[in-house]
């Protein structure tokens, strides 16, 4: 089973894996069963909890939700609440604004830029935000006497004095922001309520904020989202989409909404808007359509469980107001005929509510309802849960079956996988629309703000391509493609492990595939230097128990590796095999789906990759690049959440064992929710140092940690807690042991895009492009690298943030080393997007979180058994 196929088979949550038959089965005549063995009985009206004009439900509560964390900026709870609504969820990246790590790294305080490499002209998806001279944002606190609870009322009373405060303002019920300063520091005004009650309003100046203050940065983002709403963009999650410009793909019953991601932050020289293209994929089938389709596929007694498995966790879009909700539960005891209490105390059925409120007719009166634990506050009241009618909800996203449909993905890519020139054109449309919209321009003028009309241009660098070293041979590769599979195909490996005693397990229907694999392995292994005997071939029934029984009976202490030919990508069978061979009976294993061997024209290429994988899993070494630094240990860490319980976090920890970076120590930390993952990482580091000493007879003098899996808002915790824990761990190794430590945070999910200017057009920057100016952050020692090549669409850079460094290595050296390590991932004969130890750590954590669900046996720790 190839890594890519395995990721697709296992890498998505259960709610995304349904096979979707033809849609349109729903009709008023059909009835979904309420219980496995009986049709729904007539229901008495049910009474969900009272809510304000949003139908609430009787869904089972799944425990209290986590309260939103307070932002690290001193604004107000109300302003945070306002910003959450306008920002599209919790923008945890604002927590990282106050983390200034560069000042503590002495050798980069003055300059963090490198100089090696050839210059390249680049354009980035950034627009400068400018403000008028001496611009400031004025922050006021507003008090009411007597106290007014409702935010809408507080706003109405304050806005009676727009002659004083002006029409340009942002108010959250407590904090008022103005683009001008009021005449007095404290201003008292009086307003009247509708019933004639006098209210004294005290407006007190609390802050005069410069353009670069963290509060202003947050404020800019809120104003920008206000502008998007003015242009009729629809907020879905964090991003904004244009429902009036949809792209229809009728032959696949899909709709694509174009949209944008956006963020305004302080960068090296200026405050800038980073805008990128985003697409929302909608399906033209409703949840009810899907339920009826599923009902035709499964046994009646399993129907409700199947619905829960497929729908809980899925995001749906309501057809009446284009809002998205997460399905948290299905209430089979309610239906559209049930009633709920409105804010005025009157009762209304869901049928009547949706007809009066949205002019939506509900045809199936016996369908169950969906429950969304909608987490949003109105004033001091938490709104939720929300009841949704399946018939009125469209499904979003793609199922696993859709993702495996080559023609569908090809047709979808035409609209979503944009070339650099297409992407630049689409991003430019955003600012063009803003320029043409008079309301938007007036809002910006009133605040004293404006955006550049052209994208940011600057100069980057392209470092030289690496030479691939393989058993005395040196290979160059085409740097434009960053792939050396052809060049190294006939060369022996650095260290080839023999296939003396190995098992090949297959089913009767897959005998031909097993035989083809064996014959082709005999063809490709000699040039690699792999000595190979014929496998012990064992036929089994196509059942999980049969595979496990054969494994238990056939594996001996001399077995090198087990190869299993599987009929399909069935996750339960794969998981059972991997769990047994990674924990109970530790031995390297290779699973291959039979159909991947079915095409004669690609069989040799596929078997070559399988042979390389098998060699790695047994402890072999494939290739290397020149690493000038000596006595250097590289560590990669990545985190993953267990799919079985959702309550475990898994950290993959991978550390180099030799100076050539060709052998790795791998270990996993499985932590329950609430436990600190770093405690387990300390133990991993101690064990890795012991293993390094066994291999080299000395300890490393430098340790560089590449830390992936750090979410937005977690940077402060990593710097102030995780890094000190690593330092404490090193002290326990020995009194005189004081290696130089570097910790680099790796971030793949970035909106930044670079376009290379070439011959009057734009193309992707070549692999090895480094950017450490303009779009990096002044308070960080950070840089971007474009390491991989892509055939279609736009290449995505990776962001590296050096948060701790006592190495005193020049920025050039850190950047070059990072790029070198992107060549060392043995599951791909080419350059990948992150340093190899990060990808190894990800693969390990992914395998444990998806299939094994416990720590693998340590006897495998010196092999890349998880590739």
UniProtKB/Swiss-Prot annotation:
Residue ranges of every copy of the PAZ domain listed in the record: 286-397
Annotated Gene Ontology cellular component terms: chromatoid body; cytoplasm; dense body; nucleus; P granule
Post-translational events: Methylated on arginine residues; required for the interaction with Tudor domain-containing protein and subsequent localization to the meiotic nuage, also named P granule.
MID region: annotated segments: 485-621
InterPro entries: ArgoL1 (IPR014811), GAGE (IPR031320), PAZ_dom (IPR003100), PAZ_dom_sf (IPR036085), Piwi (IPR003165), RNaseH-like_sf (IPR012337), RNaseH_sf (IPR036397)
Basic residues: compositionally biased ranges: 1-11
Keyword Ion transport: no
Enzyme Commission code: 3.1.26.-
Pfam families found in the cross-reference section: ArgoL1, GAGE, PAZ, Piwi, Piwi_N
GO MF term list: metal ion binding; mRNA binding; mRNA cap binding complex binding; piRNA binding; protein kinase binding; RNA endonuclease activity; single-stranded RNA binding
Function: Endoribonuclease that plays a central role in postnatal germ cells by repressing transposable elements and preventing their mobilization, which is essential for the germline integrity. Acts via the piRNA metabolic process, which mediates the repression of transposable elements during meiosis by forming complexes composed of piRNAs and Piwi proteins and govern the methylation and subsequent repression of transposons.
Domain statement: The PAZ domain specifically recognizes binds the 2'-O-methylated 3'-end of piRNAs. The MID region is required for recognition of uridine in the first position of piRNAs (g1U preference, also named 1U-bias).
Similarity field: Belongs to the argonaute family. Piwi subfamily.
Protein name per its UniProtKB record: Piwi-like protein 1
The organism's taxonomic lineage, starting at the top: Eukaryota, Metazoa, Chordata, Craniata, Vertebrata
Gene: PIWIL1
